[in-house]
Curated annotation (Swiss-Prot):
Keywords tagged on the record: Cell inner membrane, Cell membrane, Hydrolase, Membrane, Metal-binding, Metalloprotease, Protease, Stress response, Transmembrane, Transmembrane helix, Zinc
Signal peptide location: none
Organism: Pseudomonas fluorescens (strain ATCC BAA-477 / NRRL B-23932 / Pf-5)
Molecular-function GO term, any one: metalloendopeptidase activity
Transmembrane segments: 4-24, 42-62, 158-178, 199-219
Cofactor(s) this protein cannot do without: Zn(2+)
Name by which UniProt lists this protein: Protease HtpX
GO BP terms in the entry: proteolysis
Active site: 148
Cofactor note: Binds 1 zinc ion per subunit.
Domain of life assignment: Bacteria
Gene3D superfamilies according to UniProt: Metalloproteases ('zincins'), catalytic domain
Gene Ontology annotations for the cellular component aspect, listed alphabetically: plasma membrane
């Protein structure tokens, strides 16, 4: 909770600085001179409230959504040797990482994958696919679990949700400025907000949203390297490298992880060209090389 409060305070400061900067550069005067009667401070606050509300709401229901979207079965009483080993391993890794034991689950998927989610590092969920448990060695599974525990311990779910809230705020803010400018200045509409405002705002939100996604995914890729480092500390560098190499050998298999969980899975799939800007994970080769350099 402290992380959320500090981040919200930081971003309130960012919003205030943005508002002051626009005023200093005479943006309000420019808009008014062109017939746009727009209170930028009120607009910025409005966008911040709605931008963060959606992001934080998604964060708080993330565990429930993850269970529903992946059909994850939570292990409360282990029924098999695999389930018992899984609970014991997660408990051990959590203790070493200094966090409370998360919920542990298995989701039905042939692909080798895993994810972590939850609004709080002491109230999280870690789940692995049936395929990963069946085909990976115990050391490889432990390394994957250590990576996911690393996400939880680093507070990555909260951090990315708040970053998403920031970009949501500015996408909404600038899209509405563009919409007003097009409506009032280009189309000379003097009677409320015309159709040009709505069309321009929607189009601007789409374009700015795509650009904002690239920013969020850049942060996500950075968090993956940190989770790999945490996995290497908890399970051993060789085991972490071995798990990533094993994942690389299965890259041809389709990934069925919901988009909302991709950023916190171990395997993010493959993209080429400009599409790499929108990858939630760095290429496995680069992650392996980073661990080798780390030693």
């Amino acid at each position: 909770m402290m992380r959320i409060l500090l981040f919200l305070a930081t971003n309130l400061a960012v919003v205030l600085i943005a508002s002051i900067t626009l005023s200093l550069f005479g943006f309000n005067g420019f808009m008014a001179a062109n017939g746009v009667d727009l209170n930028l401070n009120q607009l910025l606050i409005f966008c911040a409230v709605f931008g963060f509300a959606g992001s934080l709401f998604s964060l708080f229901i993330s565990k429930w959504m993850a269970k529903m979207s992946t059909s994850t079965q939570i292990i409360t009483q282990p029924r098999t040797r695999h389930e018992q080993w899984l609970l014991h391993t997660v408990e051990q890794l959590s203790r070493e990482a200094g966090i409370k034991m998360p919920e542990v689950g298995i989701f039905p998927a042939y692909e080798a994958n895993a994810f972590a989610t939850g609004w709080n590092k002491n109230d999280a969920l870690v789940a692995v696919s049936q395929g990963l448990l069946e085909r990976f060695s115990p050391d490889e599974v432990k390394a994957v679990l250590a990576h996911e525990i690393g996400h939880v311990a680093n507070g990555d779910m909260v951090t990315l949700a708040l970053i998403q809230g920031v970009v949501n705020t500015f996408v909404m803010f600038f899209a509405r400025i563009i919409g007003n400018f097009v409506d009032k200045v280009i189309f000379k509409n003097e009677e409320g907000q015309g159709i040009a405002y709505y069309v321009a705002t929607i189009f601007a939100e789409l374009v700015l949203g795509i650009l904002a996604s690239a920013i969020v995914m850049w942060f996500s890729r950075k968090r993956e390297y940190r989770a790999d480092e945490a996995g290497a500390r908890l399970a051993g560098t060789n085991a972490m490298i071995g798990a990533l190499q094993r994942l690389r050998s299965e890259q041809g298999l389709p990934v069925h992880m919901p988009d909302t969980l991709n950023a916190f899975g171990i395997n993010g799939g493959i993209k080429q060209g400009l599409a790499r800007m929108f990858m939630s994970h760095p290429p496995l080769e680069e992650r392996i090389e980073a661990l080798r350099r780390r030693g």
